[in-house]
């Protein structure tokens, strides 16, 4: 990538993305995040919020279970998203998965996300990006679609380039040797 291409790419990122981090050394709560996101919606017209990773947020446990806290947090975020017309994405990692008999890990789904079935129950769309380290292919598994006009459950495979960190379609391979068999 040339210097000009890099500068153009960085300009595009700065025009289309806002990175909100806790620079004061504290851990953000969901209320902190939604307050700052509300300001970004009104000042800059933000339409998408990605919380990555969710497990870096502070949750005031008190006497509630983690399951109840997550359920309440997801309800709060869902209500905020509807009020502000914003799509919200959570990057959430699964609880510990165990290898299957073939040596591979299962594809995590919504119920595998740590601490609560609410991740599955309250999501409008849920999907998993699952990398196969043997083939360097990535499987996108859509495990939930609440509203059918948004899509359907299924799986698609992509090629992953470790060097560039990019995904691409897997090219069709034409076997010209089929006549010689």
What do these predicted regions represent?
Residues 55, 94-95:
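Active-site-proximal loop/turn and secondary-structure-junction residues that shape catalytic pockets
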Residues 59-64, 100-104:
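Short acidic, glycine/proline-rich loop/turn micro-motifs
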Residues 18-20, 89, 125-127:
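Hydrophobic/aromatic beta-strand patches that form the interior of the parallel beta-sheet core
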Residues 1-63:
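Conserved inter-motif catalytic segment of the P-loop NTP-binding fold
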């Amino acid at each position: 990538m040339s210097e000009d291409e890099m500068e153009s790419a960085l300009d595009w990122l700065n025009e289309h993305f806002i990175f909100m981090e806790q620079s004061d050394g504290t851990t953000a709560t969901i209320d902190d995040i939604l307050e700052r996101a509300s300001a970004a919606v009104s000042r800059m017209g933000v339409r998408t919020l990605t919380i990555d990773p969710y497990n870096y947020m502070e949750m005031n446990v008190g006497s509630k279970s983690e399951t109840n806290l997550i359920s309440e947090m997801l309800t709060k975020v869902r209500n905020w998203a509807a009020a502000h017309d914003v799509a919200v994405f959570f990057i959430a990692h699964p609880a510990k998965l165990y290898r299957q008999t073939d040596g591979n890990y299962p594809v995590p789904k919504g119920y595998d996300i740590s601490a609560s079935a609410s991740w599955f129950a309250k999501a409008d769309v849920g999907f998993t990006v699952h990398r196969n380290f043997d083939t360097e292919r990535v499987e996108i598994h859509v495990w939930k679609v609440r509203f059918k006009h948004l899509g359907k459950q299924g799986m698609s495979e992509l090629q992953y380039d470790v060097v560039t960190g990019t995904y691409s379609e897997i090219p069709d391979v034409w076997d010209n040797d089929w006549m010689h068999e």
